[in-house]
């Protein structure tokens, strides 16, 4: 596309040059044409060079190459951090107490692999994301195979800086032969009883169709589903059948970044199946698929899904006595923030300074805060009212807004952690704009962002703008 645009630009320059030397136009118009041509060529050349360098810098190598090239560096760095046997025997290197042990830092190799995986999450197609983070391939009795995600794989696929297990990656899976009894017995390994994942058809495993649907549910506000259901509820009884639900699902999916990027790929087997094959559709409409689904039941499903995903995120931090540390909670809040690394490090240091010996947070405290975030748009409005009225946005105000808008109680300790992160100047008041913008990204888990680098869209916009500007300069309105 860029070559065609460049050739057409050069052709227009040639025409302009002949027009200029032909002397058939007034001098003023010829001067404007030459100025526009010169500025346009300079802008295209400069922008192309910068974008090309950026594309080269961000082009992801394969994960296998990263792991093989950086293996020696990672090993040498890890070996340097450990005490050798002689020092331990001499008592030079003492083992810390369990409560004093610090979390092992990510080595150079791990950081590079995580950066590559973050680019996959941000820019790749849903097909590639699924194939990279899925860990199971189940082979049926007839020899046919299908790839599945576990609930843990699903959470890892949408969470930045969560590294894929070693020896598993793109099209690399753990192979399991289909055995109905054996897989059913392993259901507890994949999902807890009572979890929404536990009710899925393949013993808590997630197929590609279910993966697309679950990401759509997580990235779509409740209000959008309410409107879509009302549009297709033709008789006004508040219920939709399977066919109407598939239309709702298709419309909602087409509005999400995942849905817009997806293309069925028969070569990999990752195609969106009809409702007849979906375990989730069976869950909604029963085994005979003749049931009805109400918006109330669907929103309850969305609430349970958000609860279960949050629970899995919480458990990934290995809670001690049912509590995670304040820094881990801060990491959950900032996971999808997009904040620059230097500022992110400064915010985490600020949190560490305030809570050197914190008591931690329970899952109930974490869940209450995320329930508060589900109403972030109303929270934004309420905080703006306080700001316009001249009231300070302190901890008491936040707790009052949570009670009024979300009907939940935020503990004093949760408010202390949030203010330690977002109280930039240390005056005990919240930085409202930054807090709301980061929390909106956290609520959507980054799933609403476009799955491309914007290079094509940028070049199209520049070309259109250059054409319009050239005509305005060359042929000014009389």
Swiss-Prot record:
The keyword Metal-binding applies. One of its GO terms (molecular function) is calcium ion sensor activity. Residues 101-112 are annotated as: Polybasic region. Ca(2+) 1 binds at residues 233, 235, 237, 239, 244. The modification Asymmetric dimethylarginine is found at residue 457. Phosphorylation at Ser-124 by AKT1 impairs its maturation and stability. The keyword Metal-binding applies. This is Calcium uptake protein 1, mitochondrial. It comes from Bos taurus (Bovine). The lineage of its organism: Eukaryota, Metazoa, Chordata, Craniata, Vertebrata. The gene is MICU1.
């Amino acid at each position: 596309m860029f070559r065609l645009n460049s050739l057409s630009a050069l052709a227009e320059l040639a025409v302009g040059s002949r027009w200029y030397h032909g002397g058939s136009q007034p001098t003023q118009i010829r001067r404007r044409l030459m100025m526009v041509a010169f500025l346009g060529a300079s802008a295209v050349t400069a922008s192309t060079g910068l974008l090309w360098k950026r594309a080269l810098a961000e082009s992801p190598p394969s994960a296998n190459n990263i792991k093989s090239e950086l293996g020696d560096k990672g090993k040498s760095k890890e070996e340097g951090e450990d005490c050798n046997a002689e020092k331990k025997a001499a008592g030079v290197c003492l083992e810390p107490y369990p409560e004093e042990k610090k979390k092992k830092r990510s080595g150079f190799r791990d950081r590079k692999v995580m950066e590559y995986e973050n680019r996959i999450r941000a820019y790749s197609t849903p097909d590639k994301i699924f194939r990279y983070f899925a860990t199971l391939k189940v082979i049926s009795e007839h020899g046919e195979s299908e790839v599945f995600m576990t609930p843990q794989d699903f959470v890892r696929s949408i969470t930045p800086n969560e590294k894929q297990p070693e020896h598993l990656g793109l099209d690399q899976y753990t192979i399991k032969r289909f055995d109905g009894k054996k897989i059913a017995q392993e259901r507890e390994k994949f999902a807890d009883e009572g979890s929404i994942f536990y009710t899925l058809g393949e013993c808590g495993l997630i197929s590609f169709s279910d993966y697309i649907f679950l990401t759509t549910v997580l990235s779509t506000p409740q209000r959008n589903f309410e409107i879509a259901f009302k549009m297709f509820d033709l008789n006004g009884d508040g219920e939709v059948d399977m066919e109407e639900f598939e239309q709702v699902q298709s419309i909602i999916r087409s509005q999400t970044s995942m849905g817009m990027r997806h293309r069925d790929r028969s070569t990999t087997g990752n195609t969106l199946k009809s409702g007849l094959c979906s375990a989730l559709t069976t869950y909604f409409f029963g085994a005979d698929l003749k049931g009805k689904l109400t918006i109330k039941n669907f929103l309850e499903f969305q609430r349970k899904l958000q609860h279960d995903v949050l629970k899995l995120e919480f458990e990934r931090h290995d809670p001690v006595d049912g509590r995670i540390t304040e820094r881990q909670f801060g990491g959950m809040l900032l996971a999808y923030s997009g904040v620059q690394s230097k500022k992110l490090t400064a915010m985490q240091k600020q949190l560490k300074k305030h809570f050197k010996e914190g008591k931690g947070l329970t899952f109930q405290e974490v869940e209450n805060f995320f329930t508060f975030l589900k109403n972030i748009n109303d929270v934004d409005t309420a905080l703006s009212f306080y700001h316009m009225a001249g009231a300070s946005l302190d901890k008491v105000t936040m707790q009052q807004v949570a009670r009024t808008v979300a009907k939940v109680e935020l503990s004093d300790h949760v408010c202390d952690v949030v203010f330690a992160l977002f109280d930039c100047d240390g005056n005990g008041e919240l930085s409202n704009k930054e807090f709301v913008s980061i929390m909106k990204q956290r609520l959507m888990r980054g799933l609403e962002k476009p799955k491309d680098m914007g290079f094509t869209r940028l070049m199209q916009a520049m070309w259109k703008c250059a054409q319009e500007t050239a005509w305005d300069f060359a042929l000014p309105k009389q």
